[in-house]
From Swiss-Prot:
Converts heme B (protoheme IX) to heme O by substitution of the vinyl group on carbon 2 of heme B porphyrin ring with a hydroxyethyl farnesyl side group. HAMAP family: CyoE_CtaB. This is Protoheme IX farnesyltransferase. It holds the Pfam family UbiA. The chain crosses the membrane at residues 63-83, 109-129, 132-152, 160-180, 188-208, 215-235, 241-261, 294-314. Belongs to the UbiA prenyltransferase family. Protoheme IX farnesyltransferase subfamily. It is an enzyme of class 2 (transferase). It comes from the Bacteria.
Length: 331
């Protein structure tokens, strides 16, 4: 029993095992370097930020400029991250075949591409949205590359707690694109993404802890071990569930329906968090939590949009009226 547990802990896990699509889809070098798999969730939280505004839905041109500018900025951030970490990637077997370490792309071409994406992104957002959305997008790019990648990641096991601000900025971009200011709803979704990020990322870090250890990156599982990490994941998981329900009160309309539809998402998240806490050394449990956490955030943003549909608003109002009638009958 001890030996099997030891194998479970020490056997390296590839990202291909965690994200099955990586096995099936081999991206060209120029696309691989911009990390396209990360972009859809960033755009989803951007749309979630929009849905929290009174001005939802947005005109199609402004929506397209916001999402296009956000996608280009995320691509630039991914490319600059690859540039910064190419020496680390070269030292890890799992990442040594990436575009930059393997020599399939040159440093200069990646840098020029990142600058071009940044300039086009800024132009789209300034001309088609507003300066606040453009400034926040640039802030997100800089915070990911400079704050997280360059400063926090190699220095502290709490890197993702503070560095998670980069991934939490898209809701602010969405809110500002819709209304010209951020508003309470935008700040709520920003906070939700901030507390969701550690639980999401540490589940992945448990799977890849040997990789991080081999290059001296102080991720929480490599510094404190899986038991401490699982407890921390549990804390952030419960915080995520608590904060997610506050969306009922910040949605301009449809809050009750959103809260009801959110129940199965939160139940599943808590179930997976509890399973990992009970056995932090089970990599399948960490893998399951990581995968569900991605679907969870997509689901929250989907529910925010669904709750703002006219049919949902009518149904939400009927639910409220039914509850009032029911409570009146007992008074």
């Amino acid at each position: 029993m001890v030996s099997s547990t030891s194998e479970l802990i020490t056997q390296p896990v590839n990202r291909e095992e965690v994200v099955p699509s990586r096995k099936r889809i081999k991206l060209p070098a120029w696309l691989e370097v911009v990390k396209p798999r990360l972009i859809p969730l960033l755009l989803a939280t951007t749309v979630g930020g929009m849905a929290l505004s009174e001005e939802w839905p947005l005109p199609s041109p402004r929506l397209a400029c916001t999402l296009g500018g956000g996608a280009l900025a995320a691509a630039a951030a991914g490319a600059l991250n690859c540039l910064w970490e190419q020496d680390l990637d070269k030292r890890m077997k799992r990442t040594s075949n990436r575009a930059l370490p393997s020599g399939r792309l040159s440093q200069s071409s990646v840098f020029i591409g990142a600058v071009a994406c940044t300039l086009v992104s800024s132009a789209l957002l300034v001309s088609g949205v507003n300066c606040l959305a453009a400034g926040l997008t640039l802030l997100g790019l800089c915070s990911y590359v400079l704050l997280y990648t360059a400063f926090l990641k190699p220095r502290t096991s709490q890197n993702i707690v503070f560095g998670g601000v980069a991934g939490a900025i898209p809701p602010l971009v969405g809110a500002s694109a819709a209304a010209g200011h951020i508003g309470l709803g935008g700040w709520w979704l920003f906070s939700l993404v901030m507390v969701w990020t550690p639980a999401h990322f540490w589940a992945l870090a448990i799977l890849l802890k040997e990789d991080y250890r081999s290059v001296g990156i102080p991720m929480l599982p490599t510094v404190s071990g899986p038991f401490v990490t699982a407890k921390a994941i549990s804390v952030y998981g419960y915080l995520t569930v608590f904060l997610s329900f506050l969306g009922c009160f910040v949605l301009p309309e449809g809050g009750l329906l959103y809260g009801i539809l959110l129940l199965p998402y939160n139940s599943r998240l808590l179930q997976l968090v509890s399973r990992l806490r009970d056995n932090p050394e089970d990599l399948d449990r960490a893998k399951g939590l990581f995968r569900w956490s991605i679907l969870y955030m997509f689901g929250v943003c989907f529910l925010l949009v669904i709750s703002r549909l006219q049919v949902s608003i009518v149904f939400n109002d009927q639910l409220i009226a039914l509850i009032k009638d029911f409570s009146t009958g007992f008074s």
